[in-house]
Amino acid sequence: MGMAAESQFHVLAVDDSLFDRKLIERLLQKSSCQVTTVDSGSKALEFLGLRQSTDSNDPNAFSKAPVNHQVVEVNLIITDYCMPGMTGYDLLKKVKESSAFRDIPVVIMSSENVPARISRCLEEGAEEFFLKPVRLADLNKLKPHMMKTKLKNQKLEEIETTSKVENGVPTAVADPEIKDSTNIEIEILPLQQDLLLVQQEEQTLSINNKRKSVEEGISTDRARPRFDGIATAV
């Protein structure tokens, strides 16, 4: 399995071919996606938190995993159509039948261009149907889903922030006023020092300007034709 940072758009890639898994993983990582790869539909359902039911004779019957099972959020599933055991179409149906995962976009891949197969998958709820080998241009079609997820996460963060503000600061935060005043004090001290420096510079500049004005006045007086005045007096 290939994993990356949790903050990225998370894609679950399902394919029984190691070559195709590596290819799709590299292409998705070029789009800054987090990628998890599995080699079968049953492993994909297990990763999502679904497991095969032991209480049923149906080999395709799946139930929810135990509560303590750690479920990683998946933003999109891309799966091969032809796989042994569980096909991509079967996986698509299982995902869409699940109340917890039906909103996850599912993309089907296949090396065979069969119109009836494509129509069946799209009617079942697949977002896209890509022909193999999948290219980067194909994955660019997934960008709207990435943007939708990003906006959804931003909205959830805003709701969470608003909820915290409405409910007040948790009691776990000790003496917020003292903490805030300390921070303000720390921030004000450098500011006061800067203001003092500015005032000192202004005073120095003012003294220099006055001195310059006096010197210019003296030099002007010195430049007057005193000898001419004496000569006239004579």
From Swiss-Prot:
It is found in: Nucleus. GO terms for biological process: circadian rhythm; cytokinin-activated signaling pathway; phosphorelay signal transduction system; regulation of DNA-templated transcription; response to cytokinin. Its main location: nucleus. The modification 4-aspartylphosphate is found at residue 80. Residues 10-147 form the Response regulatory domain. PROSITE patterns: RESPONSE_REGULATORY (PS50110). One of its GO terms (cellular component) is nucleus. Signal peptide: none annotated. Pfam families: Response_reg. GO terms for molecular function: phosphorelay response regulator activity. Keywords: Cytokinin signaling pathway, Nucleus, Phosphoprotein, Transcription, Transcription regulation, Two-component regulatory system. Two-component system major event consists of a His-to-Asp phosphorelay between a sensor histidine kinase (HK) and a response regulator (RR). In plants, the His-to-Asp phosphorelay involves an additional intermediate named Histidine-containing phosphotransfer protein (HPt). This multistep phosphorelay consists of a His-Asp-His-Asp sequential transfer of a phosphate group between first a His and an Asp of the HK protein, followed by the transfer to a conserved His of the HPt protein and finally the transfer to an Asp in the receiver domain of the RR protein. Interacts with AHP1 and AHP3. Functions as a response regulator involved in His-to-Asp phosphorelay signal transduction system. Phosphorylation of the Asp residue in the receiver domain activates the ability of the protein to promote the transcription of target genes. Type-A response regulators seem to act as negative regulators of the cytokinin signaling. Belongs to the ARR family. Type-A subfamily. This is Two-component response regulator ARR9. It comes from Arabidopsis thaliana (Mouse-ear cress). The lineage of its organism: Eukaryota, Viridiplantae, Streptophyta, Embryophyta, Tracheophyta. The gene is ARR9.
